[in-house]
Amino acid sequence: MIENVKQTTSEKLLLVLLIILGIIAFYIFVILPQKCLFIKNYNPKEINFKNPKNIAVLNVNCGNIIIKLYPSISPKSVDRFKMLITSGKYDGTSFHRVIKNVLVQSGDLEFGKKNNLDYLYVGTGKSGYGAINSELNDETEFKIGTVGMARTNKLNTEDSQFFILLRDAPLFKGEYTPIGEVVYGLEILNTIKDGYPREYVLRPDFINTFKLLVN
């Protein structure tokens, strides 16, 4: 008769560890990449734009988010935005504040960079170029895909941080500075890691690159 061989404690622990590692590997290499599987990635060079000088391409893990800027509506804010884009300041910056189905926010150049992320202060950082005045109007709608300048609870404190709406926000009209709108890749925004149930994100996603279509 063959007797059952009992597993030692160390063998049981090793088995549990292997199972855990297998689950982690399955998530990283199988589940995680699937969030981009059915997302269309747009190539801006294959699209004809009426005014390509006002097109910005925000690249994240699942592809390109193409933004049409509003220089005629908010000229000073768009100038600041373009300057930060062309100088590469936004590259490697976190989406530090993401409210599921509401908005994504990025642009903290002081405390939100990938190589220097400070969870204690992220969201309060500045660009080093100083604040600019708010450019408010009662005509531009804040709808899904609208890009706006973030600020503190005071006017004229816009700097480098910006947000993109994931749903209509009519109460934002006349309260925030609109600088553009997403024209392609809106669905990609929904793949950016959110902070649910909080607003601020632990181990956030980052901007890979942010470029103007025409410099």
Question: Language-model features: where?
Answer:
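Cyclophilin-like peptidyl-prolyl cis-trans isomerases
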Residues: 1-215
